A protein has these predicted regions:
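Glycine-rich flexible loops
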Residues: 1-146
Length: 146
């Protein structure tokens, strides 16, 4: 996963507030996602770490990017635990997903993203912390594989 450091693109007049708040900084952040030569409509990387911030993730819909963000944070916690446990007991290392596993799970995630979305919407509605005055949009439809 690429790491982006805003310090590398600041100019002399930029405030050092860590905010991506102008087109030049936005272009620099967008460029770090890379160009996917096999799928030109998708970035090479869906998630980028930002020094001093956390991460940025992109997707084709609010549902998809929410899913990516949730599971990126969740999986990072699991990976940190695995690395700490491995270091504590002198294990053989953490086995990461292979290139084929990453590709195949990305394809699977493209259609499974809507499964947790409905549950998250209901949780937010029940929490009372959010009032949607626009109404509930229709549920997204999965593309048919006919």
């Amino acid at each position: 996963m690429p790491n982006w450091d805003i310090e590398t693109v600041y100019n002399a007049s930029d405030p050092r507030d860590m905010l991506v708040n102008n087109p030049r900084l936005g272009d620099a952040l967008a460029a770090i996602f890379g160009i996917n030569t096999t799928q030109p409509t998708s970035p090479l990387h869906r998630t980028v770490l930002q020094r001093g911030h956390g991460f940025v993730t992109v997707g084709t819909s609010v549902e998809q990017v929410t899913d990516f963000a949730y599971y990126t944070a969740s999986n990072a916690r699991v990976q940190i635990s695995a690395l700490l446990l491995n270091g504590a007991v002198g294990g053989e290392g953490v086995k990461y997903l292979s290139a084929q596993e990453r590709k195949d799970t990305a394809n699977m995630n493209a259609w499974i993203v809507f499964k947790p979305w409905a549950q998250w919407v209901k949780e937010v509605e029940r929490s009372g912390m959010f009032v949607n005055e626009l109404g509930t949009p229709p549920a997204p439809q999965r593309e048919s594989s006919d």
